[in-house]
A protein has these predicted regions:
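Flexible, low-complexity junctional segments that flank or bridge functional domains
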Residues: 1-190
Length: 190
């Protein structure tokens, strides 16, 4: 356990503390968490992190999409039924920003030791307006556009609406993860 005194904050190298708490006008516990996360990210230790307070001050909006990590990237594993033909497509960008850039940017918010950790972090948060708005400051509140490379090698754009977290949870619970349907379930041993 380490304490961080005011003197400790002053002694942290500027490259590791881009915006000190002294310079920021922090008004909520959630904002403080984001600032501390930015401070911890350069440590590149995925086991050093801070969780949000139990009661969050803001409600979250999410896009109806879910991803899975595969071969150094992300593929779509859940989408609304009308876009089901795009399941298995590789994510190549969000709002025109290439995934490689997003991997680097998310590593400034969530500590990770390696490239796989960066990909996994984007996998977990690529549907979250709260996180994506930190990576894409121009992100709108009503919808988001994903750039995908389909299994038959076509690049397409798909625009999805954001929805309240409770509605997203309901949607997510009703969507079967069809990306696993091709995995054999009988006569299989590990």
């Amino acid at each position: 356990s380490h304490s961080l005194s005011e003197e400790g904050i002053s002694s942290v190298p500027q490259k590791m503390w881009p915006q000190t708490l002294k310079e920021k006008n922090t008004t909520t516990a959630e904002e403080l968490c984001w600032q501390i996360r930015s401070f911890l990210a350069p440590l590149q230790d995925g086991h050093t992190y801070i969780n949000y307070p139990t009661q969050q001050t803001t409600s979250h909006i999410l896009a109806p999409i879910a991803f899975r990590t595969i071969s150094g990237g992300l593929i779509v594993r859940k989408l609304p039924v009308k876009h089901e033909s795009l399941l298995g497509s590789r994510l190549i960008g969000i709002e025109g920003i290439p995934v490689d850039t997003l991997y680097e940017e998310i590593s400034k918010l969530y500590p990770t030791e390696n490239e796989t950790g960066k990909i996994l972090n984007l996998c977990w948060y690529a549907h979250s307006h709260t996180v994506l708005s930190k990576l894409i400051p121009t992100l709108k509140n009503d919808s988001i556009t994903y750039q995908l490379n389909t299994p038959d090698n076509h690049n397409i754009r798909i625009k999805l609406p954001f929805m309240p977290e409770e509605e997203w949870k309901e949607w997510n619970d009703t969507q079967k993860d069809k990306s696993r349907s091709k995995i054999p379930t009988t006569n299989l041993s590990f």
